[in-house]
């Protein structure tokens, strides 16, 4: 299979679907887990935060290692480790502490497959198609999350969270096998660094790169907080209309899966638009719409569920739409020898912020009692504030004279 071809990209995207089904396992079953594991909202958010922090550390380490030994090699090791840890999590996560430890270890394994996958796409897909290719790659992530949420919605009412965990853990095993088959013959590229070239000059003093990283950091705060708590919020909306908790959790997972489907569509569409219109205009449009949704969404508890779901679909579309463009942009404003290092810093900042978001969100819920529209409203506002900072970062990027490469279209309209 020719690296960079349509068939190669399709296969690596499908492997992404399976690999990331386990990513949302905890959030999808959270309403049931809070009761079964006797967790407060703060404790529940703590598990999500530890996952994101471990994921950030893994992304940083694996990205830096990829610069030195090649992205292909690190990607393959990450897929194998992810399959093993997914199976262990599904089999042995049965209370707060086992869930915390195993979910954190799972995050360390999954981190080996994300930025290394981004690097593989950047290395093998021509620049004129890179935006849409990155969009399709990240769309595989969203499809995996949607599939996992749908499976969880079926499983929790039939076999509880253990059955849900077992079903979604099959994804990294199948996805890992597909990834191994596709990527094993892809060249392992190691770009040597020119003498005198240093990280500080290539990244830290690179204004467009740092503004992209700043935008991505607060985008991640908003997105990962939203992903962590939207299934529970939708479950609360169903419970508020009279559903039992288990049924509400299942319905919430179903509806959250649709949110991720719109995110998948956004990734693909935004990638195409970014190639045609330029990276910055599409980032600004998506970030602005997502911020508005964050500021409104939580206050809808108690309104008709159809209204909540409708806005949730728009929210899911906008919140993820700019993600592949940030990933593409950072590879275009940093010299190839330092792409991994730049992605490492981006990942540490973004997923570090994403680790804080669920914990702060849960703390706000506890502060306001956890059940009212006021509690959910202010919790989602905390995500909207981060989204607003992302918008400001993109506006500053649009005014940077050395960021012109991100303004122009890559293909003819």
What does each of the following model-derived ranges do?
Residues 1-2, 186-214:
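Juxtamembrane intracellular "pre-TM" segments in multi-pass secondary transporters
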């Amino acid at each position: 299979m020719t690296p960079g071809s349509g068939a190669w990209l399709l296969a690596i995207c499908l492997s992404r679907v399976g690999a990331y089904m386990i990513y949302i396992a905890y959030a999808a079953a959270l309403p049931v887990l809070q009761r079964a594991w006797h967790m407060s909202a703060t404790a529940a958010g703590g598990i999500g935060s530890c996952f994101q922090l471990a994921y950030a550390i893994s992304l940083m380490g694996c990205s830096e290692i990829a610069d030195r030994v090649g992205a292909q090699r690190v990607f393959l090791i990450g897929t194998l480790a992810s399959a093993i840890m997914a199976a262990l999590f599904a089999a042995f996560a049965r209370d707060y502490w086992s869930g915390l430890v195993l979910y954190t270890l799972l995050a360390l394994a999954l981190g080996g497959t994300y930025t290394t996958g981004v690097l593989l796409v950047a290395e093998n897909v021509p620049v004129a198609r890179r935006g849409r290719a990155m969009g399709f790659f990240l769309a595989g992530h969203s499809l995996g999350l949607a599939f996992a949420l749908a499976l969880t919605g079926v499983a929790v009412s039939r076999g509880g969270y253990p059955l849900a965990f077992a079903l979604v853990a099959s994804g990294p095993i199948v996805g890992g096998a597909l990834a191994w088959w596709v990527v094993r013959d892809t060249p392992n590229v190691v770009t040597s660094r020119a003498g005198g070239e240093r990280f500080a000059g290539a990244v830290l003093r690179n204004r467009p790169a740092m503004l992209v990283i700043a935008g991505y950091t607060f985008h991640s705060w908003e997105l990962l907080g939203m992903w962590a708590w939207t299934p529970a919020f939708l479950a609360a909306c169903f419970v508020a209309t009279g559903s039992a908790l288990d049924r509400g959790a299942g319905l919430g997972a179903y509806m959250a899966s649709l949110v991720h489907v719109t995110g998948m569509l956004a990734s693909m569409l935004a990638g195409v638009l970014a190639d045609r219109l330029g990276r910055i205009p599409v980032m600004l449009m998506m970030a602005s719409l997502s911020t508005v949704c964050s500021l409104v969404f939580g206050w809808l508890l108690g309104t008709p569920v159809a209204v909540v779901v409708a806005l949730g679909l728009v929210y899911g579309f906008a919140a993820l739409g700019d993600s592949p463009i940030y990933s593409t942009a950072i590879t275009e404003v940093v010299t190839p020898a330092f792409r991994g290092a730049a992605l490492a810093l981006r990942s540490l900042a973004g997923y570090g912020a994403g680790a804080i978001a669920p914990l702060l969100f849960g703390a706000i819920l506890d502060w306001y009692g956890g059940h009212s529209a006021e509690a959910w409203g202010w919790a989602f506002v905390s995500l909207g504030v981060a989204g607003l900072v992302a918008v400001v970062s993109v506006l500053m990027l649009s005014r940077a004279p050395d960021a012109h490469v991100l303004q122009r279209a890559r293909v003819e309209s």
